[in-house]
Amino acid sequence: MPNIKSAIKRTKTIEKRRAHRASQKSDLRTSIKNFEKAVAASDVALAKSTLLVAVKKLDKAASKGLIHKNAANRQKSRLMKKLNVLSAPVA
């Protein structure tokens, strides 16, 4: 435990920020899982709408520094591929 007053304050601030970021990351993962459930159910309309939500949250997380920009782009690319496979016409 810190003894200096400013260090005590920083510890409280760090804990608040950690909890906030954990909540945001959890929300992000939930939106991605919702998309993957829609893909598993082969529901193209639901998959498209949940993909928009997931992409928006990924972009927001990347802009806020919650995740790296390249990580967000990689995840978006993988989600788009899943949607393209689902919505491709069966030959």
Swiss-Prot record:
GO terms for molecular function: small ribosomal subunit rRNA binding; structural constituent of ribosome. It holds the Pfam family Ribosomal_S20p. SUPFAM superfamilies: Ribosomal protein S20. It comes from the Bacteria. Residues 7-23 have a biased composition (Basic residues). One of its GO terms (cellular component) is small ribosomal subunit. Residues 1-28 are annotated as: Disordered. Keywords: Ribonucleoprotein, Ribosomal protein, RNA-binding, rRNA-binding. GO terms for biological process: translation. The keyword Transcription does not apply. Belongs to the bacterial ribosomal protein bS20 family. Binds directly to 16S ribosomal RNA. This is Small ribosomal subunit protein bS20. The lineage of its organism: Bacteria, Bacillati, Bacillota, Bacilli, Bacillales.
